Design a protein with these regions (language model features):
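A metal-dependent hydrolase metal-coordination microenvironment
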Residues: 1-74, 78, 171-174
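Acidic (Asp/Glu)-rich catalytic clusters
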Residues: 3-16, 36-45, 82-88, 115-124, ...
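Hydrophobic faces of well-ordered beta-strands that scaffold small-molecule active sites
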Residues: 19-23, 47-49, 91-93, 127-129, ...
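Low-complexity, flexible helical/coil segments
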Residues: 54-61, 79-87, 126-133, 162-169
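Surface-exposed cleft-lining segments at the edges of enzyme active sites
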Residues: 58-71, 97-107, 137
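Hydrophobic, well-ordered secondary-structure segments
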Residues: 73-80, 89, 113
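Active-site groove signature of glycoside hydrolases
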Residues: 87, 91-95, 99
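Charged catalytic cores and adjacent phosphate/nucleic-acid-binding surfaces used
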Residues: 99-100, 104-180
Length: 180
């Protein structure tokens, strides 16, 4: 069990490191009661906001592959702001995820990025500068996330950032790309 193994490590290394337990979670309004129960049951230290789907993964496609229209961008913005305003999350992971599939950083992207960043700044909610796709971007000679235009807006709006890797597999952390 994930949490149980981390509790064991917390105890084992309590005099050497401070180990926190958290999960990346969606903002799905219909499941908030369940999510709050999970947080209580497992005594999680925090949860991270990952905005991958609009309100549910049962009806809406993944933003990272399917944000190709202004309508999808607007759904991304709406759920991003709702999730941030929920007060549940410690920070917003990869807030520029829509740029994994949106064709170019156009005026629509600028507008929703400004709205997202202003909300994050107002709430004092950090945004994750996710370097987990840097090696992919480099290998394919493209720019997805972290997207420099989004982060210019985040800086201009006075956002706080936290650096993350989004390592779904620990081998991602062992990639020499990130250490050279």
């Amino acid at each position: 069990d994930y949490v149980e193994s981390l509790r064991s490590l917390q105890e084992k290394y309590k005099d050497r490191i401070s180990l926190k337990i958290g999960l990346e979670c969606e903002y799905f309004p219909d499941y908030l009661h369940w999510l709050k129960e999970v947080i209580r049951e497992f005594k999680l230290d925090y949860i991270i906001f990952g905005n991958h789907h609009f309100h549910t993964d049962e009806k809406f496609p993944y933003f990272g592959r399917n944000t190709k229209t202004v309508d999808m961008l607007e759904l991304y913005e709406e759920s991003a702001i709702e999730g941030m305003e929920s007060g549940l999350f410690a920070y917003f992971a990869h807030p520029d995820l829509f740029m994994r599939s949106y064709p170019e950083f156009d005026r629509h992207c600028k507008l929703i990025s400004r709205h997202i960043c202003r909300t994050a700044a107002r709430l004092n909610l950090p945004l994750e500068y996710n370097i987990g796709y840097e090696d992919y971007n480099d290998a394919h000679k493209i720019t997805t996330i972290p997207h420099p235009d989004f982060w210019k807006i985040a800086a201009a709006e006075g956002c706080t950032a936290i650096i993350g890797v989004d390592a779904h597999n620990n081998q991602y952390l062992e990639t020499p790309f990130y250490y050279d």
